[in-house]
Amino acid sequence: MRRILHVLLVFSALPAAAGAQTLPQRIAALGSGTVHLTFAARPGVCGDGLHSIRVVEGNEEWQEDCEPQQVRVALQVHDRRVTEVRSYVGGRWRPGVSATDLGTVRPQDAAAYFISLAERGGDISGDPLLPATLADSSTIWPALLRLARTPAVPLATRRTAVFWLGQAAGAAAARSLDSIAGDSAGDREVRKQAVFALSQRSGNEGVPALLRVARSNPDPELRKTALFWLGQSEDPRALALFEEILR
């Protein structure tokens, strides 16, 4: 009886042990091959499963159709390292495809994993930050800011982080872009990307920061870039600056 009880206890502990594995451990355990995982998309994220991923917007009286959808990510793994990331929104996995399906994972876990994947760098095909930006219930702009400011991170990844930071909602994201653009010790290309991202903020939200760059940044190339994007904004504050300069 004691032996039977012991065996039952051992087997009852197995699922808990398997469940204790982190998402990176589950992916690395494959060794080599294709991994599929699925997680909830944040509100407003839509897609057709392949050709289109978009974030819909509306106004006070109209809202574009966008049913809650899931993000599906295929990872190509070789010798326990991810070599390719393919992201989809909507659709479904084709049956019969040779892949290890991890099923549905927590969006917060997925976002953290893809941020760490981007931070690792290396020769990865695809954009690991894209699925992180799509994940539901995840605030990733602090991680994007950290990536953008870390010299050890590959330049291409840092520029991509700034791009996605520019797409993030909220005043905190705009302030982060402002701080990157004004960081005289930062990489010029990353700072120029921050200036561009500021110009893309909705409602001319980035105009005050662009005005500061154009007026007082010590780098003439950044001032020139800020002036260019201010010229595209058609904002009265930008026109006032041009009048001030030309006077």
Segments (PLM) and residue ranges:
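Positively charged n-region of N-terminal signal peptides that target proteins for export
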Residues: 1-4
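Bacterial N-terminal signal peptides
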Residues: 6-15
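Boundary at the C-terminal end of the N-terminal hydrophobic targeting segment
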Residues: 18-20
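N-terminal accessory interaction module
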Residues: 22-117
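Amphipathic alpha-helical scaffolding segments comprising HEAT/armadillo-like alpha-solenoid repeats
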Residues: 107-118, 137-149, 170-182, 203-215, ...
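Alpha-helix N-cap/helix-start positions at coil->helix boundaries
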Residues: 122-123, 153-156, 186-189, 204, ...
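Alpha-solenoid repeat junctions
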Residues: 132-136, 165, 169, 198, ...
